[in-house]
Design a protein with these regions (language model features):
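Flexible phosphate-sensing "switch/lid" loops adjacent to ATP/NTP-binding sites
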Residues: 1-186
Length: 186
């Protein structure tokens, strides 16, 4: 949902932004896209790249993420999506209080710093890419807990951090626009 909210907010600020749906729910929301988990593994990167090329006339492409690089069941799709879309920047999504990989109770989620580095490393295979913000899912946290965790993440990573539903997407939108401006200068 982060990418949907960011797309909406970017368009409201006058940017020509396209949400690229990569899963069934995203397709229902957007009306188009490709359900990457239904594509044969060898072709997922190409399917992602095709969507980027089809919509490259937009100023900003907001590509829906899939799974997690640290989830053994879904990391193949996640990695293929990263390699196929060649992102310029990433918004890392994180849920407060989730300590185990969903559906694999014996597998702990690594520290967020490790996940961030892993995403940046694997997204930078073809072109440089970095995490430019963190989207926090604080649905299981009290407002005070969410505020404290957001502040902790800002201090630890020096990045914009927001729960797009609790805080609004503004801080993350600013990070995207800053990256866009920097890329236009380069």
């Amino acid at each position: 949902m982060t990418s949907v909210e960011l797309t909406r907010a970017l368009n409201e600020r006058g940017n020509d932004t396209k949400f690229i749906a990569t899963g069934q729910t995203g397709i229902l929301i957007e009306g188009d896209g490709i359900p990457l988990d239904c594509v044969k593994a060898d072709f997922v990167s190409g399917a992602a790249e095709r969507m980027v090329l089809e919509h490259q006339h937009h100023e900003i492409l907001m590509i829906e993420g899939q799974g997690s690089l640290v989830h053994p069941s879904y990391s193949g799709v996640t990695l293929s999506l990263l390699h196929g879309c060649h992102p310029h920047g990433l918004i890392l999504c994180y849920e407060i209080g989730r300590h185990k990989v969903t559906g694999i109770d014996h597998l702990a989620i690594p520290p967020l710093a490790e996940i961030l580095k892993l995403n940046e490393s694997l997204a930078s295979i073809s072109f440089p890419c970095s995490v430019i913000g963190i989207s926090v899912n604080s649905r299981r946290a009290t407002p005070a807990e969410a505020d404290a965790e957001r502040d902790r993440l800002r201090d630890e990573f020096g990045l914009p951090v927001a729960d797009v539903f609790r805080d609004g997407p503004g801080e993350l939108v600013d990070a995207i626009l800053q990256l866009q401006q920097q890329r236009l200068k380069d």
